[in-house]
Amino acid sequence: MPQIGLVSAVNLRVQGNSAYLWSSRSSLGTDSQDGCSQRNSLCFGGSDSMSHRLKIRNPHSITRRLAKDFRPLKVVCIDYPRPELDNTVNYLEAAFLSSSFRSSPRPTKPLEIVIAGAGLGGLSTAKYLADAGHKPILLEARDVLGGKVAAWKDDDGDWYETGLHIFFGAYPNMQNLFGELGINDRLQWKEHSMIFAMPNKPGEFSRFDFPEALPAPLNGILAILKNNEMLTWPEKVKFAIGLLPAMLGGQSYVEAQDGISVKDWMRKQGVPDRVTDEVFIAMSKALNFINPDELSMQCILIALNRFLQEKHGSKMAFLDGNPPERLCMPIVEHIESKGGQVRLNSRIKKIELNEDGSVKCFILNDGSTIEGDAFVFATPVDIFKLLLPEDWKEIPYFQKLEKLVGVPVINVHIWFDRKLKNTSDNLLFSRSPLLSVYADMSVTCKEYYDPNKSMLELVFAPAEEWVSRSDSEIIDATMKELAKLFPDEISADQSKAKILKYHVVKTPRSVYKTVPGCEPCRLLQRSPVEGFYLAGDYTKQKYLASMEGAVLSGKLCAQAIVQDYELLVGRSQRKLAETSVV
């Protein structure tokens, strides 16, 4: 992962002007005769600015020469090969679940399943039901796919997104989904490092580099031990001792930590507060948009468990373009190719019940009704709670939802009039009190690539006190924080880099707020109401409130429906018989 715009072989504190390069890590030094590498190249379709080809005979000699002349690259855009994920236990487990839908007996009467919400949970549910031979009808309230990964195109043709979405190696169901759709090449894998800004040293960063040659957890342990800028050796030792119970206790220990906050758990384990301040404020905000005094320790341990036990678990990839087109549309096309339907602008007004309390139909805003053999709600938990029928509110299963509340988050996009130098081809942890993670999307993402101007996408969190404020106030506050990250290039008054335009996307209720005591409130996908199911990252599954959790929840929801096939067919037949008698 290049830091401050440089490949790791170069002195990271030296900055200067030079050309931008974009290549594949696996193809360096293997250029074809026309100047483009045979596997990946500088030339990307769909952008005039990507049509120029550079012949790079030896990139490593270039970096050595630049270091000597103090004219290093601003950033070397390098996409790394897809890591070897396919033989990991979690990937194979996810692959087996996927294959169970394709190999299940074809239904004599395919079920029509009405699904509310075309986020990743709803799309996943529909995709795997279609694989099992059923006919999903997926309804999306808005005119855009994706839910929490939605994005929009402005009048200039530029995209702005709901969030800054990172695809980890520790996302086995998501990685399987990309493979099943044949779009693995749409993930741009970055160098296996985590880069943290140094608040006390404006403009400087500290790295955790995971060595490729070592297996997990040794690669992660060495990455921590080699970093001497954020933690002292005594702090590392105390932190390691504090983590021992989690490493030895396994999943049962992790689940038992749901009731304690990150900050309280660290103190209980004798871990210095400075470790929490230096590392876990940034990690907590990245995982759930809140600080460690609020976040459940279970959330952190789930992430650490994946990152430390899987060699490529913490390796990160960016999608090569906007999520609705590059990820969601392939899922929709797959669903429709198997006879399913996806309908936009289909907002649900009411869940209409039968006399026995089961679902009769969904009533849409336009007054139309949608009936089916089964019904799924795959919306965010707050939307489902708003539409929860009165007759269901006394059912203990649904009463558990009361504690689950979405956390507010803001995603900020700023287009600058110049290319920023103090950036990197990867995700960056700002360690700012107002900002969480950020990236220069003009570098990390092919569709957003711009050789002349930077576009920073930043997660503004915690956002509870800011979500009701004006966009201009949020931008002003963001610029003050960016002035610390880019002291030579950005000032709050724009006397340096100037803003060309910006977009602020507010999500008042995003993923559920993972405070202590929430785990028992996460519901199984099969509800006690016959024929009604739930999907979404807030439902019961072993991953965080994340894209991976949403995809897995959809698979588990589809699995429950397939398992209930005979029951649902019998229910439909009874309903048909009752209608005939009337």
UniProtKB/Swiss-Prot annotation:
Inhibited by the herbicides metflurazon, difunone, fluridone and diflufenican. FAD binds at E140, A141, K148, H165, I166, Y171, I348, D537, M547. Gene3D superfamilies: FAD/NAD(P)-binding domain (3.50.50.60). One of its GO terms (biological process) is carotenoid biosynthetic process. Keywords: Carotenoid biosynthesis, Chloroplast, Chromoplast, Herbicide resistance, Membrane, Oxidoreductase, Plastid, Transit peptide. Its EC number is 1.3.5.5. It is found in: Plastid, Chloroplast; Plastid, Chromoplast; Membrane. Transmembrane segments: none annotated. Pathway: Carotenoid biosynthesis; lycopene biosynthesis. Pfam families: Amino_oxidase (PF01593). It is a peripheral membrane protein. Residues 1-110 form a transit peptide. One of its GO terms (cellular component) is chloroplast. Substrate binds at R306, A545. It is an enzyme of class 1 (oxidoreductase). Its cofactor is FAD. InterPro entries: Amino_oxidase, FAD/NAD-bd_sf, Phytoene_desaturase, Zeta_carotene_desat/Oxidored. It catalyses: 2 a plastoquinone + 15-cis-phytoene = 9,9',15-tri-cis-zeta-carotene + 2 a plastoquinol. GO terms for molecular function: phytoene dehydrogenase activity. Its main location: plastid. Homotetramer. Belongs to the carotenoid/retinoid oxidoreductase family. This is 15-cis-phytoene desaturase, chloroplastic/chromoplastic. It comes from Capsicum annuum (Capsicum pepper).
